Amino acid sequence: MTAGVSRRALLIGGAFCVSTISRSIAATRVEIEQFDANGVSTGVAALDKIVKSDAEWRAQLSPRAYDVMRHEGTERAFAGPYWDDHADGLYRCLGCETALFDSKTKFDSGTGWPSFYAPASKHNVVETVDSSFGIRRTAVSCARCDAHLGHVFTDGPRPTGLRYCINGVALSFAPRGAKETAR
């Protein structure tokens, strides 16, 4: 009977380990909608999550971008890039170049931050509850590298009524039709 219990425990333990490893491997992949240089979707692909050490992020990002993207900081209003930019193209994550917002959804919110009424794809952003500073908000981050981008509010224009208030320092801009960078 002892051998039966041991075998059962071994099988259960082994199944648990396989299940845990499978979930862990799945958590390292994420579905990202990809866009060509003209902003046209080329489909959704399962891509590896971008995971870097703190030292690697510090080396890649400016101090201000590092604070915003890795520690949920906020740039000063009217001080960051893109708040008053009207060029046609895609706004991408500075950390991993994932397409986040299209200039076609950008609007002047008067807040001093780049504002959009919709992301380029719901696959490419993650929204989570942020209760810091004693207020309940919805934080927005990049789905591929977990970079903090900003917050989304329900005071935006039609057609969504949403305002994605994004830190410009967390973005890069690719003019529509520009040759894509590989990353």
Give a label for each model feature:
Residues 38, 49-52, 58-60, 68-92, ...:
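A short Gly-Trp-Pro
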Residues 21-60:
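C-terminal segment of N-terminal export signals and the immediately downstream linker at the start
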Residues 8, 21-24, 35, 128, ...:
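Compositionally biased, intrinsically disordered low-complexity segments
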Residues 1-17:
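N-terminal secretory signal peptides and thylakoid transit peptides that target proteins
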Residues 7-11, 40-48, 93-95:
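Short charge-dense sequence patches
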